[in-house]
Amino acid sequence: MDAIKINLDDYELFGGGANGESFNHKTDPTVMLKLYRPGIVQQPLDEITLARKVYEMGISTPEPGDYVTTGDGRYGIRFRRITGKKSYSRATGDEPEKVGQFAREFAGMCLQLHATHVDTTQFENVKERYFRLLGENPFFDAVQKAKLERFIADVPDEDTAIHGDLQYSNAIFVGNERYFIDLGDFCWGNHLFDLGMVYLCCNLSNADFIEETFHMPKSLAIKFWEFFAREYFGPGIPLKEIEELILPFAGLKTLIVERDTKRPMPELRVGLESILS
């Protein structure tokens, strides 16, 4: 797929994250741009390819537009702009008294996503993705990798959708319309792999990161998780039992974080203690 060259002067910055920045078009209110940081080339191409497939499946996500590049060699994607939207992380930070409402709405989106059956010939299996990430990771030794491979292999298979980067900043809403965004890691498999990211973002990440990335204090993020977990799993399962189930899957997200940061993340590996001990 060839990238369309754009002039970044036509866009206005409105936000950013670990991998890139978001822009609105200055004169066309229906267009937004997600631009990756310099040197990130394959991820935007993978994301738009997947985004088109996911959109065609009927999963609620903004309609993807074009694969683009800037004059200085950065790559990104143009999407249909959802005017007036907010992410669930931003909304929670802005209105902390509504944390329960926002967490329950996000949980409802996740339940619907994880009930969606996928044509498994069209997308990657989450286990294969983790096996690949583990093989590429230079920060685990051979014994640790063998234990992690065994854990991943033993997880029961499911043929349902996985977002792949299920942060509460990657779900947006406006009015009664709700959308998932940032679907570059979309795949299929056991839903627990997805829920690990929710737990990591609310509980394992350090307070400064949560404040900067998700616009709220860590204490509020933990409350978000507690409301989310009760809505997702139902009232019959104690929170401690849910967290014991999810913690190793949150720890596995270390493989993604270490891929992106190119350094070991011991503060996140605590989630892997039950596997590696």
Task: Report residues per predicted region.
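An alpha-helical support segment within catalytic cores of ATP-dependent transferases
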Residues: 1-2, 115-164, 168-169, 174
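Regulatory N- and C-terminal appendages and interdomain linkers associated
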Residues: 1-4, 260-277
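Conserved N-terminal boundary motif of the eukaryotic protein kinase catalytic domain
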Residues: 5-13
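ATP-binding pocket architecture of kinase catalytic cores
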Residues: 12-120, 156
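Hydrophobic "anchor" residues on beta-strands that sit immediately upstream
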Residues: 30, 76, 159-161, 178-181, ...
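Short, glycine/acidic-enriched loop or turn micro-motifs at the edges of active sites
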Residues: 83, 166-168, 185, 197
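Catalytic activation segment of kinase domains across protein kinase-like and atypical kinase folds
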Residues: 171-195
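Active-site activation/catalytic loop segments of kinase-like enzymes and analogous catalytic loops
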Residues: 195-235, 249-264
